[in-house]
Structure formats: structure tokens, C-alpha cells
Curated annotation (Swiss-Prot):
The keyword Transferase applies. Pathway: Nucleotide-sugar biosynthesis; UDP-4-deoxy-4-formamido-beta-L-arabinose biosynthesis; UDP-4-deoxy-4-formamido-beta-L-arabinose from UDP-alpha-D-glucuronate: step 2/3; Bacterial outer membrane biogenesis; lipopolysaccharide biosynthesis. It comes from Salmonella paratyphi A (strain AKU_12601). PANTHER family: TRANSAMINASE (PTHR30244), UDP-4-AMINO-4-DEOXY-L-ARABINOSE--OXOGLUTARATE AMINOTRANSFERASE (PTHR30244:SF41). This is UDP-4-amino-4-deoxy-L-arabinose--oxoglutarate aminotransferase. The modification N6-(pyridoxal phosphate)lysine is found at K182.
Length: 379
């Protein structure tokens, strides 16, 4: 019997093992020099002046919203087609999430939906670069500038993604994820990039107890002594063990993403003979990171529901994912916003399915998936 094929698997090798050993041998395993190396390397990738490594992208979103002063009564616009952590952070700060619809075919938040949701209480806009493709940043930043509203890019899916020749994040502030299924991973982790030095300083303080110094001081070889708390903060710093793995992964990013793109191209070719509908690509110039390959399973077209397809693939030893069940349909948000309807988000939320896609996926793995899809479709 064939081994179970997961929908994602991290691409780890000798380089990551060596990186971990180096940190263990150094005697300094928590936040230290590897964090600074990672931040500098990520700035070279995105073109930003500052990067702040954190324990997760969720942590990064939390302190980014705090650094903007988001609080009681404020509104933050974001799509419902996202992971709920963004909504949770908004709510936990006492603010109100304003969830908007997305384009039916790309699942990207549109500037039209954003602008329609802007009120005098709007204090931030959070577009999501979905599945590895970029949102329409020119139009979204134009809205931010017109109304004086900061934009924070949710780039959890977008390490390696470019929009009109520039890496995601280069326009301002963006938050990336190093979670286990992401394009590069260190098990858990994230990074915030920005060109605003005051904003970066706030992030560094908030991620480490609100202290007026970073978690690591290059000159003293540790944390500066007698540091004072400037404001209450959190314990969101990234250990060097994780940072070292992320660095090793970052050095492989081009190769990892090239393999993802090759598999995605094979999927697109194979879908021509199947009833399942992949997402459309954005019309603007971009480089897709192919974090996810998503199909829509419409029962009227496919003869099967999404949930039944996922269950059938599981019986054949093939894993899938759901990215995402729309946030406003989750119990807490459904009860808090009982009248909210987002037609294109809801249509997709009931039909989307993420197929296996990861750099170490073999040709035989790919053939298994396509053969199974043909069998399920009755072909």
C-alpha cells in the first residue's frame, strides 16, 4: 500500500540540520545573531530597510496593529477569505473587523470592495496576497493615500511573490509567515518588513516585553543590561534555532519556488481534462509563489461536493486542505455579524480545495493525484 500523500510537506535537508547544529554548538539558542542575519537577508529579498523577526505571522499582525494604535472603536478592513488570526487580533485589540468580499475567480480583495467599506472610523486596510499571488497594490495603496489610511499587507502566502517587478513588501509594511506549510519554514515564525524606522522600533519593543532595547544587542553579545519597559509588550521573539532554519530555507527559496511553479503548471495542464476549476491568475504583472494550488469543486459541474471529494481523496491516501472556510462563517463571527453576506466569498468557501503541492513532491505523487481526480470524476 502506498504511503499517505500529504497536501504539504516541508523541504528539509542537510543545510537545515547543519544550521541547527551551529546554533546548538554556539551556546546561544534563543534570540541572537541568527535573528539579525535573517532580518538582513529578508530585507535584501524584499528591498525594505527594516525587518523584525517574530514568533509567528499572527504575532507580527498583533504588534503591527498595536504599533498603529488600533484600539477600541476603530475599524480595520480585511477580506473574510483569510485565516481567522487576523480577525482575532483586531477583535482582541477592541477594534471592529470590517470583512469585505473578494473577486470570485482570483479570491483577491478588490479596491472597489475596500473603498465601499471605508468610514471615518477606518484605521487600517489589510489586503491578503492569496495563495501566492499578489493583490492589486497600486489600486489599494492609492486608496490608502487618498483617505489617509495605513496599509498592512498580509503576505503570509507571499514569500517570493512579486507585483509589477517588486517583491511583496517593497511598497511599505508586510507580514510574512514561516509556518510549517509555507514556502519557507522554520516550523513556526514570521517576519515584518517596513521602511519606517519609528514603526520598526515600536515592533521591536512590543515583541519583547515592551523593553526599550532589542532582544539581542550586537555590542554586548546579549541583551543590554538595565533595560526599561517603555510600555506593556509581549513575548513574541524568535529563537535563533528557528531563525537559523529560516535562513537555510531562504537560501533555497528560488529553487523551492521554481519546483512549486513547475508542479502548478502540470496541474493547470491536467485540469483541462477535468471538471474542477483552478483559481484564475491576476491580470496585473506578477510572479506567483504558488504557495497553494486551489481548485473549485462545484457539484453542478463536477457531480460531487467539495467535502465529498476531499473524503474520497483521503480514502485513496491523498491529503487536501481547505484555505479557507470564510472567517465570517465561523461560529464566533457568524454570531457577531449575523446579517453579513459576501456572495463571492461564500460561493468559493463552499467549493475550494487545496491539492498537494510541495517542492519534494515527485512525478509519481503528481500522477497519483491526477489519476484519483479522474477516477472520482468518472473519467
Amino acid at each position: 500500500m502506498l504511503d499517505f500523500l500529504p497536501f504539504s510537506r516541508p523541504a528539509m535537508g542537510a543545510e537545515e540540520l547543519a544550521a541547527v547544529k551551529t546554533v546548538l554548538d554556539s551556546g546561544w539558542i534563543t534570540t541572537g545573531p541568527k535573528n539579525q542575519e535573517l532580518e538582513a537577508a529578508f530585507c535584501r529579498l524584499t528591498g525594505n530597510q527594516y525587518a523584525v523577526a517574530v514568533s509567528s505571522a499572527t504575532a507580527g499582525m498583533h504588534i503591527a496593529l498595536m504599533a498603529l494604535g488600533i484600539g477600541e472603536g476603530d475599524e480595520v478592513i480585511t477580506p473574510s477569505m483569510t485565516w481567522v488570526s487576523t480577525l482575532n487580533m483586531i477583535v482582541l485589540l477592541g477594534a471592529n473587523p470590517v470583512m469585505v468580499d473578494v473577486d470570485r475567480d482570483t479570491l483577491m480583495v478588490t479596491p472597489e470592495h475596500i473603498e465601499a467599506a471605508i468610514t471615518p472610523q477606518t484605521k487600517a486596510i489589510i489586503p491578503v496576497h492569496y495563495a501566492g499571488a499578489p493583490a492589486d497594490l497600486d489600486a489599494i495603496y492609492a486608496l490608502g493615500e487618498r483617505y489617509g489610511i495605513p496599509v498592512i499587507e498580509d503576505a503570509a502566502h507571499a514569500t517570493g511573490t512579486s507585483y509589477k517587478g517588486r517583491h511583496i513588501g517593497a511598497r511599505g509594511t508586510a507580514i510574512f509567515s514561516f509556518h510549517a506549510i509555507k514556502n519557507i519554514t522554520c516550523a513556526e515564525g514570521g517576519i515584518v518588513v517596513t521602511d519606517n524606522p519609528q514603526f520598526a522600533d515600536k515592533l521591536r519593543s512590543l515583541k519583547f516585553h515592551g523593553l526599550g532595547v532589542d532582544a539581542w544587542d550586537r555590542q554586548s553579545g546579549g541583551r543590554a543590561p538595565q533595560a526599561e519597559v517603555l510600555a506593556p509588550g509581549y513575548k513574541y521573539n524568535l529563537p535563533d534555532l528557528n531563525a537559523a532554519i529560516a535562513l537555510a530555507q531562504l537560501q533555497k527559496l528560488d529553487a523551492l519556488n521554481a519546483r512549486r511553479a513547475a508542479i502548478a503548471a502540470q496541474y493547470h495542464q491536467a485540469m483541462a481534462d477535468l471538471p474542477f476549476q483552478p483559481l484564475s491568475l491576476p491580470s496585473w504583472e506578477h510572479i506567483h509563489a504558488w504557495h497553494l494550488f486551489i481548485i473549485r469543486v462545484d457539484e453542478a459541474r463536477c457531480g460531487i461536493t467539495r467535502d465529498a471529494l476531499m473524503a474520497s481523496l483521503k480514502t485513496k491516501g491523498i491529503g487536501t486542505g481547505l484555505h479557507f472556510r470564510a472567517a465570517h462563517t465561523q461560529k464566533y463571527y457568524r454570531e457577531r455579524f449575523p446579517t453579513l453576506t459576501l456572495p463571492d466569498t461564500e460561493w468559493n468557501s463552499e467549493r475550494i480545495c487545496s491539492l498537494p503541492l510541495f517542492p519534494d513532491m515527485t512525478e509519481s505523487d503528481f500522477d497519483r493525484v491526477i489519476t484519483a481526480l479522474h477516477q472520482i470524476a468518472g473519467q
